[in-house]
């Protein structure tokens, strides 16, 4: 059956590069949302702990529960239903209206909208948020924001950095006024970290770089990272097609000579985005995908028992006119994973 192989060596290499840029392992929070960008939540969390990472970021409480014993600190980004809670969980407050929904005595990181206009409270509402949380005995353990264009060549990155600097000053003044401890500050995602000279925040939230990718790395002279994931498929059947015969739905690939063709057990049902006559892809070993990708299989000009479908998703991202994130996160979470 199809299988995802996860390279421990490559993951550790990436985490080492990230940790050195951040200043230490303690200043790195590995982002594990959406099944660790398709790589496997528990698998990547276990390896990150082994490397020495103590902070993680997930999407929901249910995700946090699966890795609760692996980290000292888990930031939950988008939870609305608090059926359980742990002292290691820190809940993102995305709007003022959510203050009344938070568990009593919980830890909260206030998200501030510094320009992305997606989630977070406005800077002018910070004191209102602190007072509302204080009334409910909820501890503000962090304040953060998210960059909308750190991986793009524009001034947005510097504009948002300046906005967050003003937020930090405001928060410090509020905490002094209310006799509260200064919370942790964090804003840098993968691209923002590597565009920041002399990183000085409390920690960085690193997602895609953990898994070996930094989009537009050539533009910013980012470090070369190593992809962690490779997707492998097993042979289902083999046949010899005569010259002029066609393969798959629609018969969009026709042989120009007698050809050996095998089907392999990966398809768009596994989250491998559909290829067709307008989207041509060749595997790392040089086998071209023939015709249309089906729900459960695809065809190649080989009879190898196992074939590496990809070990770097950047080429597929170009073919599908998308980003590396989408290629990995759309993979079916039920695909077997093996750490190598």
UniProtKB/Swiss-Prot annotation:
The active site is at 33 (proton acceptor), 249 (proton acceptor). Its EC number is 5.1.1.1. Pathway: Amino-acid biosynthesis; D-alanine biosynthesis; D-alanine from L-alanine: step 1/1. SUPFAM superfamilies: Alanine racemase C-terminal domain-like (SSF50621), PLP-binding barrel (SSF51419). CDD domains: PLPDE_III_AR. One of its GO terms (molecular function) is pyridoxal phosphate binding. Its cofactor is pyridoxal 5'-phosphate. It comes from the Bacteria. GO terms for biological process: D-alanine biosynthetic process. Keywords: Isomerase, Pyridoxal phosphate. One of its GO terms (cellular component) is cytosol. The modification N6-(pyridoxal phosphate)lysine is found at residue 33. It catalyses: L-alanine = D-alanine. Substrate binds at residues 118, 295. Belongs to the alanine racemase family. HAMAP family: Ala_racemase. Catalyzes the interconversion of L-alanine and D-alanine. May also act on other amino acids. This is Alanine racemase. The lineage of its organism: Bacteria, Pseudomonadati, Campylobacterota, Epsilonproteobacteria, Campylobacterales.
